């Protein structure tokens, strides 16, 4: 997990004791007043994961907003640095941080930032991340650690054909459908139900006709609950929300084309949510023309739970929900990322 560490001081910024840098000598300064700017230092603690198409742990640029009662501040840093120092007047602020949008977002009000939409076209080499909290800048002080969370979900999937049917069924392609084109970066607004706000990702042709593994990143798409779905076998295109995200897997059978549809979501029946900063690990085994064994794990930093799951057809599987944030005990993609004592 990435953490932003902010330090406010009236004098020159002081390195935190937990950092490897030594403390700078303190210098006497007059007490801060509402008309006296104070220096605020921002520190970012992260370790890079192994190189991949999208580096989900990278911080490449930062927009910082302080929204106060009488004054707002905006700071833009086009490149990562060990720390950033800026001056603001003492007061109570809502602090908002946005990373990896690759542009100066400019000054805006808090309501404008909440309504701001990020386009998926910008998610090429990294993932946008955000954080916010209320802070009181009184003078020389250390602000609480600020955790930055990803504005996208990670779908890690493996598709394979069971050995018993591999002579007759050959994998050909996979495609993610109903993928959001944009998302708000703050708040919990419901996802759009307008089909024009979604697209079908490129078809990925599969060379190995028996197994295929890959990772797909997508913006949040929470299509909510369909309470009328009480049987997992009814989690199908006929009953799913029109904009719910799903995987379309195409294979060749004996003189026929086979298509398997797998909906994403957070339970075995009624839920069709793919939330930001979650990791879904999907192990899909095709066992016949009308049968696909689907094991889905959803990782999220907010909760844990388990349930039985059947996706679209009759095969029962396991559906686990465990923390997404990397911990000392669980490192799913990279090691050494600081996750805090709670994990």
Where are these predicted regions, by residue range?
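Positively charged n-region of N-terminal signal peptides that target proteins for export
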Residues: 1-5
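Tryptophan-paired
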Residues: 49-112, 158, 162-276, 321
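Extracellular beta-sheet/turn segments enriched in Thr/Pro/Gly and aliphatic residues
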Residues: 114-162, 267-312
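C-terminal functional modules
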Residues: 303-304, 310, 317-325
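Surface-exposed binding patches on compact interaction domains or structured appendages
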Residues: 325-343
């Amino acid at each position: 997990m990435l953490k932003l560490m902010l330090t406010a001081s009236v004098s020159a910024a002081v390195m935190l004791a937990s950092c490897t840098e030594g403390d700078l000598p303190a210098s006497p300064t007059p007490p801060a007043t509402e008309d006296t700017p104070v220096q605020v230092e921002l520190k970012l603690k992260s370790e890079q994961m192994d190189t991949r198409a999208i580096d989900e742990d990278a911080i490449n640029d930062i927009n910082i907003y302080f929204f106060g009662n009488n004054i707002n501040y905006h700071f833009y840093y086009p490149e990562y640095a060990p720390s950033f120092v800026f001056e603001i007047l003492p007061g109570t602020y809502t602090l908002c941080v946005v990373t990896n949008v690759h542009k100066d977002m400019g000054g805006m009000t808090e309501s404008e930032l909440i309504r701001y939409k990020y386009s998926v076209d910008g998610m090429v080499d990294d993932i946008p991340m955000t954080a916010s909290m209320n802070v009181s800048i009184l003078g020389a002080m250390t602000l609480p650690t600020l955790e930055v969370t990803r504005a996208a979900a990670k779908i890690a999937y493996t598709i394979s054909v069971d050995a018993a049917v591999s002579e007759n069924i050959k994998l050909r392609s996979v495609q993610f459908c109903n993928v959001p084109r944009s998302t708000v970066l703050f708040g919990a607004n419901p996802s759009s139900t307008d089909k024009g706000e979604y697209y079908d990702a490129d078809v990925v042709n599969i060379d190995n006709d028996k197994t295929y593994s890959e990772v797909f990143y997508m913006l949040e798409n929470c299509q909510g609950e369909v309470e009328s779905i009480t049987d997992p076998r009814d989690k199908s295109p006929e009953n799913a929300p029109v904009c719910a995200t799903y995987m379309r897997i195409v294979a060749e059978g004996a003189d026929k084309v086979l298509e398997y549809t797998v909906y994403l979501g957070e339970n075995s029946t009624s839920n069709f949510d793919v939330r930001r900063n979650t990791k879904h690990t999907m192990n899909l085994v095709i066992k016949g023309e009308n049968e696909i064994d689907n094991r889905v794990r959803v990782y999220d930093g907010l909760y844990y739970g388990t349930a039985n799951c059947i996706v679209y057809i009759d095969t029962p599987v396991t559906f686990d929900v465990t923390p997404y944030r990397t911990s000392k005990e669980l490192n799913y993609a990279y090691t050494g990322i600081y996750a805090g004592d709670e994990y």
